[in-house]
Swiss-Prot record:
Organism lineage string: Eukaryota, Metazoa, Ecdysozoa, Arthropoda, Hexapoda
Biased composition regions of type Low complexity, renumbered to the chain: 255-273, 612-666
Keywords in alphabetical order: Cytoplasm, Developmental protein, Hydrolase, Protein phosphatase, SH2 domain
Family membership noted in the UniProt record: Belongs to the protein-tyrosine phosphatase family. Non-receptor class subfamily.
Region (Disordered): 246-273, 599-666
Record gene name: csw
Start and end residues of each SH2 domain: 1-95
Biological function: Required in all receptor tyrosine kinase signaling pathways. Functions downstream of the receptor tyrosine kinase torso, acting in concert with D-Raf via tailless. Also functions downstream of Egfr (epidermal growth factor receptor) and btl (fibroblast growth factor receptor). The SH2 domain suggests that csw effects its role by mediating heteromeric protein interactions. Maternally required for normal determination of cell fates at the termini of the embryo.
Protein name: Tyrosine-protein phosphatase corkscrew
Catalytic center residues: 460 (phosphocysteine intermediate)
Region annotation (PTPase insert (Cys/Ser-rich)) ranges: 174-325
Amino acid sequence: WFHGNLSGKEAEKLILERGKNGSFLVRESQSKPGDFVLSVRTDDKVTHVMIRWQDKKYDVGGGESFATLSELIEHYKRHPMVETCGTVVHLRQPFNATRITAAGINARVEQLVKGGFWEEFESLQQDSRDTFSRHEGYKDENRLKNRYHDHTRVKLQDVERSAPGAEYINANYIRLPTDGDLYNMSSSSESLNSTVAACPACTAAQTQRNCPNCHLLNKTCVKCAVKSATLPTNCATCNRKSDSLSKHKRSESMSASANASAAGTGPGTPTAAGNTSAAAALNGCLAVLLKKHCGDASPPPSTTSSCSGPLTGSLLNGEGNQFKTYIATQGCLANTKTDFWNMIWQENTRVIVMTTKEIERGKTKCERYWPDEGQCKQFGHAKVHCIKENSTNDYTLREFLFSWRDKPERRIYHYHFQVWPDHGVPADPGCVLNFLQDVNTKQSSLAQAGEKPGPICVHCSAGIGRTGTFIVIDMILDQIVRNGLDTEIDIQRTIQMVRSQRSGMVQTEAQYKFVYYAVQHYIQTLIARKRAEEQSLQVGREYTNIKYTGEIGNDSQRSPLPPAISNLSLVSCKSAVAEPLTAAAAAAAVAANAGNKHAAKLQPPLPPLGASNNNNSSGNSGSYCNSSSSTSTAQHNGVVSSSNNCSSGSGSANSSNANGNGNILGNGSNMRKSNFYSDSLAALKLQQQQLHDAATAAAAAALASAAAPAATTTAASASAAAAAAAAAKYKNIPKDMNSLRQPHAAYVAAAPALPPPPTPPRKT
């Protein structure tokens, strides 16, 4: 129910459009930073109640005070407030927010597992109405090729212009939202169509959601069912309005692009200049979306500027320079192989991602558009030579030498993911995360080598389900890598933005769940890996078996933690949510996090979620752990009581099948390109050292007690000093080794001295 930085108008709009009587949310106060506002829908209007923060307590301007916001909300759920006019303010159901901090992914997944996935996905489906034109796809010559949006489609340049539909291909540019886009997003329950005024018929359909009979029956009543049956399913009036709006925005962006090109400010591109309109159209689309997110506010300059060349990840102007661009396309048909390779050459794509098998369940999902290893094949003007092919448990990597119209060859890397099941989604998100890391590593290495690779081309069969799932996961992970675990992520809104560029992306509820599980798995891995590095520093040795493979067959390459994660302190994470910052501490935090706009945002001191933030994904084990040792398997029962989603426990050396009971990291050994291990020898040495220290302390205490009465004070001082030294000595022991820690020296004094360890047999 906590929506962070949300304005009062946005809160009213959300609750009135999507909520029902009794729906409530809590947001940060816009007028008084540090305070919060409780917004409740009562009798089809919204009541705002100020929540004050003073003397380290929360109150609503009188009455009882509470240590946390959660306690205040629970209290007023049981004891409703009464307005001065006599209206009772009932807090019946929270209006859930989908925008969360990355570190809070476990709590969000746990909440959705209880029944919220279906509701959230259905809300996404209802918000995905057509707001952009598809006129090109409806033409007779293109009807069998594509049904997707016009403003982001890829246009082929090197074709016969006389043939109708020759420049048309089933492919769309997908751009990662800039940081400005994400920062200006309002709560994800807001409809994407808020700027398009609906006709009376659609307005009537919208009001049916607030029918009290439907709410009472928990289903559509007969009256609403009859009324909805008479309404148009695809309103022409709304479509005309949205088409004219999108045309207006596209014309603005294209004129801006033309001005930039005339001024000579655009970057040079390796592809045809005809794609300028496509890039400008997509920027115009994102400007429309951003305006919808921000209300009437103008979008940041980085999102309104158009690029003067084709839309590639390394060629976008402004803030977009940091981010990748993808091409989502359909799997090749028998008559589209030449068009596919034409697009690959035109866009200077060097990495192709294929997420489907050629045949699944007896049906052809994608025609083979490449030759066998060592063979060369011609596809129209395209000549493709497969020079190498390597396979892993999850995917096959092929290397092609590709030329178009006998021009100089380019090296293409074809990543063919082959373990996606015919039904549903993979049981282990780790295999997908490993795959994405290898793909991104290759794309980055090409950019560092100065080859200026174009967009990554991703396709499955239809180019929307698995393709959208892979792209959305990669977008979210890139955001976390850039901004750290304190960044705000919104999976639902990210999918909405991707669907605005190619409709239907992330097609099923199972795929929607999988996006959450994959992001959760990745965040758990970052925390576990960071914690492993901290433990290695505390114990004073390096984890030599944690390896990070950058590509196939190269285990010597290590990838460091992202800077946003390596600077993270797990200890500070625990205290950051425990109590609010003072003014001095807040100023220090702002200074320490300069350049990170998310770090300075105020958050309510919510109570620790404790062991309730368990990982609810099922059986995440497998290829996400690349083991380099096969000596032991650890079973750990780590319990976490803090809200920073950190684990306490060791991992497994020979596989990722460690049992984590009550462990917030789920399968605690799972981590990206690495896994933990149980150092039994080191643990035994540490235990023996602790036993020896305890025996020494006990002997010293016994000698002190046997001394003269005059030395009682001295003995007490020595005992206290020994206790303090012991406490300091064990202060930095990791939680998963607390079981090896001995009791306080004061309690050991009365215990009998432990016998020395047996002498090992002499070797002969």
